[in-house]
Structures are given as C-alpha cells and as structure tokens.
C-alpha cells in the first residue's frame, strides 16, 4: 500500500490498494464457527507496483494499519472480554462489586451500612441504648485483668461469665423489688414475707447450682473457683409507704382549736399594748410642751394635766363601748404585765383588769380624787376646779 509520490489525496491511490485498506465484508461461514468477534481474511499479497514509489510521512500515516482492523486484535481483546464475562457472572451470583455499577455510589453506601450495623443500638426498658460502654480507669484495669485470668479473647465473653456467676444476686434483687412493689400496693406483710421466701429459696438453690457449675467449669479449665457472695452487712431499710401519714383524730383537732384560740388572745393583747404605748407617748409629749410654756408654780398647769387625763379617759370609754358592742373580750389579768409610768397607761391597766364598765368605776373615783389635789414643793394642796 504505497501511494503515488506527492499525491494530494487518498483518492489518487489505485483501486486494489484501496480495497486492501478497506476490504469488503465477507459472508459468514456456516461450516466454521469462530468464537472471536473478528474474522480472518485470506488474501493474496498485493502485487508490486509497476511504477516507482518513494516513502513520505503522509504515506506512512496512511499506510499504518488501524487497530480495529489488525488481525491480532482478537488476541488483545479476548482477555478484556473474559474479565467482563467473569464480572457479570460474579454480579449475578451476588458477590460482584464492579458489575456495571460505579464504585463511588454503592461502595460508599455499603460501607456506611456496615458501619451503622456494627454500632447499632438495642431497645431496653430505659429506651434505646448503645451496645458500647466506657469503663473508668480502675474498673477497666480490673476487668481486663479478669479477662486475662479467664483466658477470654472478647470482652463480651467476660461479661457473660460475670452475669452467670451473679445469677443469685440478680434474683435476690428481683425478689426485693417485687416485695417492695407489694408493700406499696398495700398487701399484708405475711403475704409479702411468704412470697419473698418462695422467691428467695429457689434463688438460693439456683444460685448454688450456678456457683457449683461455675466452680466445676473453673476446675475443668484449671482456674480458681469463685468465692461465695457474702451477705450484706447493712441491709437496706424498708421503703416508706406512700400513704403512711397518720389520720388526725378528735384529740388532735381539739388541740389545734385550743392553739388557735391562744393565738387570737395573744393578738388582741398585743393590740392593747400598742394602743397604750401610743397614748403614753402622746400624753408625755403634751405634758412636756405644757411644762415648757408655763411655770410650775401656776395652778393652771395642774388643770391642763387633769384636762388631758380626762380626755384620755373619755377616749378609752368610747373605745371600751365599741369593743363591748363588737363582742371582743379581753381576759382579766393579762394587762397586769404592762408597766407604764403615765396616767394613760394606768387607765388602760384598769380597763383590762375590769373588762367592763362596772369594775372600772372605783378606778375613775380614785383618779378624780387625785385630780382634786396637786403637789407643790412637797406640800399637797386641794385642787379648786373653779380657780381661774
């Protein structure tokens, strides 16, 4: 396949050379079946050209055979075809990963599913919990030391061994919880004790059997038997019932009413003390003001003092009448605790001792007699009401 020298286009190549480059498609042979996708063509070598030919770069490019038309292409494509067929067979069997699906999609999803399945949570009485747990430093050291002594290669086996060895304690806790629930429900103590005994005996028997099995297992493996579990030195106190509050009886109600009456009396007494102290302060202030304005030799000073005393007595009479109409009674003898220096406080004390109008008449007569005389320089003179 050598073109003419300096040929401008491939169309100037002779026909037999063009047929050599692109041969016609032959008919399939029914007698000989070939397994490859390409057929071998038996052709004679081209005759040598009668004209001289010179090599050129364009001719070399055109003369280079195409990879698709190379007769040994079957040998190059056959391994790749076998790989595709094997991948398809693996994909049909469920073990293939590259069976026509990109790795970036299903590979990442499969890896995520595997990671999620490894750390899946479990449903417990307290909700969803993770299967992994974090141990403290001391517990982790003891745990792995026990695992090394037992010769286990997985932590779950060590935990299973611990659960098997503590069956008796677990059953005891379950029986205690059942008895506490029965007590909270209000059942009798005998039934609770009976149930507890019924639960505890099989637990002890089961625990003994478990300990025996564990000891036998330890002896068979050449390991030390586990020590029996000691009884608790300080048993748990029984739980208090929800309805353990005592019901109040008649005696407690009567005591409560008595305490309420005492509080009411104390409140009334403090009210009278406050009133007496206010009146005493007011009377002392008025007396001091009157003493500054007038000399002590003037008899009108005593008149002012007596008039203020009469005013205080009138106010107390009005207050006592209103108290008597309202039904407020003050017990006699309580106001004796009040110590006052003025006449107003003396009037309050007399009113508290009497508690009514009839008992306070003698006190008013005594006050009237004291008002009729006044003292000057250690000498008591009779007070004249008509003195101006």
From Swiss-Prot:
It comes from the Eukaryota. Keywords: DNA-binding, Growth regulation, Nucleus, Transcription, Transcription regulation. Residues 210-224, 247-269 have a biased composition (Basic and acidic residues). Residues 180-269, 289-331 are annotated as: Disordered. It is found in: Nucleus. Its main location: nucleus. One of its GO terms (cellular component) is nucleus. One of its GO terms (molecular function) is sequence-specific DNA binding. Disulfide bonds: none annotated. The keyword Nucleus applies. It holds the Pfam family TCP. Residues 115-173 form the TCP domain. Residues 289-314 have a biased composition (Low complexity). Disruption phenotype: Increased lateral branching. Residues 250-267 form the R domain. GO terms for biological process: regulation of secondary shoot formation; regulation of shoot system development. Probable transcription factor that functions as a negative regulator of lateral branching, presumably through its expression in axillary buds. Involved in the fine tuning of shoot branching. May function as an integrator of multiple signaling pathways to regulate the development of axillary buds. Works partially downstream of strigolactones to inhibit bud outgrowth. Binds to MADS57 to suppress the negative regulation of D14 by MADS57 and balance the expression of D14 for tillering. PANTHER family: TRANSCRIPTION FACTOR TCP18, TRANSCRIPTION FACTOR TCP4-RELATED. This is Transcription factor TB1. It comes from Oryza sativa subsp. japonica (Rice). The lineage of its organism: Eukaryota, Viridiplantae, Streptophyta, Embryophyta, Tracheophyta.
């Amino acid at each position: 396949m050598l073109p003419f020298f300096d040929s401008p286009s491939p169309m100037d190549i002779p026909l037999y050379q063009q047929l050599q480059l692109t041969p016609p498609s032959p008919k399939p042979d029914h007698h000989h079946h070939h397994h490859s996708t390409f057929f071998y063509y038996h052709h004679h070598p081209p005759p040598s050209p009668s004209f001289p030919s010179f090599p050129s770069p364009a001719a070399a490019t055109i003369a280079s055979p195409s990879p698709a038309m190379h007769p040994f292409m079957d040998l190059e494509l056959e391994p790749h075809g076998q790989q595709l067929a094997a991948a398809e067979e693996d994909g049909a069997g469920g073990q293939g990963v590259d069976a026509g699906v990109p790795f970036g999609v299903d590979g990442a999803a499969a890896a995520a599913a595997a990671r999620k399945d490894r750390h899946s949570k479990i449903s417990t009485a307290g909700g969803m919990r993770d299967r992994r747990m974090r141990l403290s430093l001391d517990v982790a050291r003891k745990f792995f030391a026990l695992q090394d002594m037992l010769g286990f290669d997985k932590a779950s086996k060590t935990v299973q061994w611990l659960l098997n060895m503590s069956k008796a304690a677990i059953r005891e806790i379950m029986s205690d919880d059942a008895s506490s629930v029965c007590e909270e429900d209000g059942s009798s103590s005998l039934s609770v004790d009976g149930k507890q005994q019924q639960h505890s005996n099989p637990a002890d028997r089961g625990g003994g059997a478990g300990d025996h099995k564990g000891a036998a297992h330890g002896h068979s493996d050449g390991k030390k038997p586990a020590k029996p579990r000691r009884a608790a030195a300080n048993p748990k106190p029984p739980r208090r019932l929800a309805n353990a509050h005592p019901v109040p009886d008649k005696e407690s109600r009567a005591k409560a009413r008595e305490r309420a009456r005492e509080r009411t009396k104390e409140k009334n007494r403090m009210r009278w003390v406050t009133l007496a102290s206010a009146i005493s302060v007011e009377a002392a202030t008025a007396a001091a003001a009157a003493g500054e304005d007038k000399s002590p030799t003037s008899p009108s000073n005593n008149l002012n003092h007596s008039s203020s005393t009469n005013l205080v007595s009138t106010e107390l009479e009005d207050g006592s009448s209103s108290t008597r109409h309202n039904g407020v009674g003050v017990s006699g003898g309580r106001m004796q605790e009040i110590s006052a220096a003025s006449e107003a406080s003396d009037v309050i004390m007399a009113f508290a001792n009497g508690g009514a109008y009839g008992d306070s008449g003698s006190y008013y007569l005594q006050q009237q007699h004291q008002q009729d005389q006044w003292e000057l320089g250690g000498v008591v003179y009779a007070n004249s009401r008509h003195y101006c």
